[in-house]
Structure formats: structure tokens, C-alpha cells
């Protein structure tokens, strides 16, 4: 698990990245399923600030502050309704009151579930949400396991899964097994984050933990990034990397 704070036009956005254990290849003790559930739970506790068992390098305990902007990214190896993970594993994030489900879809995912058949025919998750193209005979079939999940209050302008249909010229980039790139599909979102504090709100209480700010500025809460502004961000997460595009005035800058 990585919490990477990124400053976007004066507002801190916490990129929360992880790759929980696949809930498969298990013995009778189901160790991998349990690890997957708990590794997902860590972020659920962290964004709800109920993670008293966690502490940072300065010894401060807990997770993010209530007004923190964040986006959870990665391959979480858990589908809401299908696959091998424990029931409710990914719902710890998808149903959290702190999190927005961007619900990205693709035409290719729905089409492939129909064409490939097998386990896909008995799945309960809408195949338009699928992000992974896995073995269908006998299982697990295609699954939704890759996510871009921002904090509540974030404006989701666009979201999707890059999974072209077979008649699309870009299908060569995803293809069929053995895949030319990955069995995971790129999940992307264009997000506009809320500002952390409005200019009329008081400064954070000195009783709350603070982090040093440049000379002449009020201190900020260590995990909040309490600045005004409405930063826009486009995010894509796929196998092996993350692309973050931020809009600053009339220019675009990219960070990878």
C-alpha cells in the first residue's frame, strides 16, 4: 500500500495505490482470500480515519482527515459478485460513504463475455464493468477487478474501460490470449476534486496534527491538503503503471 500525496494547483490529492493478493491458489486455510479481504479493508479504514493500528513516520496514528482528497487505484483482485474473493471484499470500498464508484464501462467487455461464453454466462456482475479477460472454461471468467475510486464530493466527468470490440482497429492493442499487452484492461477517469476548505472556513485547530508549510502560509493538516481550488485530474490505471494528467491554467502537464 502506498499513499502518494500529489500537489495539484495547491490542493493535495492522495494517490492510494495497492495490489492485494489474488484470492486464489489457496489451501484449506484460505490464506489468500483472507489476505485479499484485509488488504482491501486497510484502505476502507484509512479513508474513514478509523485506522488506529496505523501510524506514520512521525508516530501520528490514524488515516486521512475528513476533508482529504484521494483516489484509490489499482488491481484489487476482487469482483463485487463473481470470482474467488470473499463476499463483500471489494464492497468495503464500493459501498463506503467516503468513496465514489466511478462505474466505468466498455462495449468490448460486454461483447467478449457473450462471445467467450463459459463461466461468463453465469456471472452476476454486468460484463460492461469487466476489466480482466481471464480463462472461461471452467472459470473464473472475465471480472471487474481494477478500480479508480475518488473521495465523495468528487465530480466524475468521464470514466471508462479501454476494451475495444473486435471490429475496432484498436483491438490489436488488447487482443485475445495470448495477449499482446496484458489480460487487464486500462481503467480511466476524468475527475474534478472538491477544494478541501473554503476561504471563509477557519484555520485547522492547533490541537490537530499539522505539517510544516512554506514560510508565510498557515500550517496544513498532515493528511488533508487544506487549500482552496478545484483541481481537475485525468487518471488511467492499467498493468504496470499509472498516468496522471493535471490541468493548470491553460496547460496540461503529465506525471507518470
Where do the model's predicted regions map?
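C-terminal low-complexity, Ser/Thr- and acidic/Pro-rich disordered "stalk" regions positioned immediately N-terminal
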Residues: 195-224
Amino acid at each position: 500500500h502506498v499513499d502518494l500525496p500529489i500537489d495539484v494547483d495547491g490542493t493535495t490529492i492522495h494517490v492510494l495505490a495497492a495490489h492485494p493478493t489474488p484470492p486464489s491458489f489457496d489451501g484449506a486455510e484460505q490464506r489468500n482470500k483472507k489476505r485479499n479481504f484485509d488488504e482491501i479493508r486497510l484502505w476502507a479504514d484509512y479513508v474513514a480515519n478509523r485506522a488506529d493500528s496505523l501510524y506514520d513516520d512521525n508516530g501520528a496514528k490514524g488515516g486521512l482527515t475528513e476533508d482529504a482528497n484521494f483516489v484509490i487505484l489499482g488491481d484489487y483482485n476482487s469482483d463485487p459478485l463473481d470470482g474467488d474473493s470473499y463476499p463483500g471484499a471489494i464492497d468495503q470500498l464500493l459501498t463506503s460513504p467516503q468513496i465514489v464508484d466511478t462505474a466505468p464501462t466498455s462495449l468490448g467487455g460486454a461483447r467478449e463475455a457473450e462471445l467467450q461464453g463459459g463461466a461468463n454466462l453465469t456471472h452476476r456482475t454486468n460484463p460492461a464493468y469487466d476489466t480482466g479477460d481471464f480463462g472461461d472454461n471452467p472459470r473464473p471468467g472475465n471480472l471487474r477487478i481494477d478500480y479508480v475510486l475518488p473521495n465523495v464530493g468528487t465530480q466524475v466527468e468521464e470514466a471508462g474501460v479501454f476494451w475495444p470490440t473486435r471490429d475496432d482497429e484498436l483491438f490489436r492493442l488488447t487482443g485475445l490470449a495470448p495477449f499482446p499487452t496484458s489480460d487487464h484492461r486500462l481503467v480511466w477517469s476524468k475527475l474534478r476534486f472538491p477544494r478541501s476548505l473554503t476561504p471563509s472556513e477557519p484555520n485547522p485547530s492547533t490541537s490537530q496534527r499539522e505539517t510544516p508549510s512554506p514560510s508565510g502560509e498557515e500550517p496544513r493538516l498532515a493528511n488533508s491538503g487544506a487549500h482552496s481550488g478545484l483541481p481537475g485530474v485525468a487518471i488511467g490505471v492499467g498493468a504496470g503503471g499509472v498516468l496522471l494528467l493535471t490541468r493548470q491554467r491553460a496547460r496540461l502537464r503529465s506525471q507518470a
